[in-house]
Amino acid sequence: NKIVDGDDVLTVMIYHGIGLKQSYYNDIDPRIDLRSVESESRMKELKSHGHKNLALTGFTKCDPLSSINQEKLNSFKLDQNLKTILYAPSFYPSSIEMLNQVFPELSYETNLIIKLHNFSWFQDKYKNQSKMMLELAEKNRNIFLVPRDDYNIIPYYYNADLLISDISSTIFEFLYLNRPIIMAECFNLRLKHKIFNKRFIKKMDLSRMESIDFVLRLEDPNNLISLVYHSLEYPKDLEQERLVAQREYLFKLDGKASYRMVNAIESKLIGSNN
């Protein structure tokens, strides 16, 4: 997308996700006047990459978690006697193809809400993912697929007792609620990334991925159900790690990241006018 230039224009960047891809550090235009940063650790990392005009705000996307509207959640008619799981995978690399076969059995005793990335709906090379999940939801009573025109994942976080994801930003966003997280590391890689694995590794923020200690990691899809039941029965497991991670990855959990961003914008504008 083209960024409008001009002395009377202030360009602000608020990143849509805070996941595990190197694009977080590289996907920035020199025209950006101010960039929202979600944590002190990321602030230091961006500065080490030479980025400037940074504002430490927290993650604005998570602000609504402090006041959730239940109306959207009730439309699914969830079984109130069952625990609710949210599955929110990335589009690539994704765990969808690997976990697809396990979900029907998982849904026997849980509500399973599936929230797909926008690319899984609208990009041709990923559309098979949404087709797969549509079929699952149609055939299984307790599996609910969030409609493609519902972009906002935040309300679904609130209703979930547990999150399952992979390399998605959701594993950091869900930290806000201090609830169990399962991180699937079983991916279906493209052929070129299977053959030339270094190309795939180059795209990932491996040091950040390896430092994650607040999740239960899943390598074998056949172990998913036992991990889910363990997490639901012992939700306090890894709680201390999650609380530490909240401070590490989300700065402040006060619902005021957007206010800090607005204040940073106003300060920038005042400075530009002086």
Predicted region positions:
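Conserved catalytic-core segment of nucleotide-activated headgroup transferases in glycan assembly
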Residues: 61-134, 146, 218, 232-233, ...
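C-terminal alpha-helical cap of glycosyltransferases
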Residues: 254-274
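Structural alpha-helical scaffold elements that stabilize or flank donor/cofactor-binding regions
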Residues: 4, 28, 105, 155-156
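Donor nucleotide-activated moiety binding/catalytic core segment of transferases
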Residues: 126-172
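Conserved acidic residues
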Residues: 9, 33, 83, 158-161
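Catalytic binding pocket for nucleotide-activated donors in carbohydrate/polymer assembly enzymes
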Residues: 48, 53, 169-249
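Short, well-ordered beta-strand core segments
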Residues: 11, 35, 163-164, 181
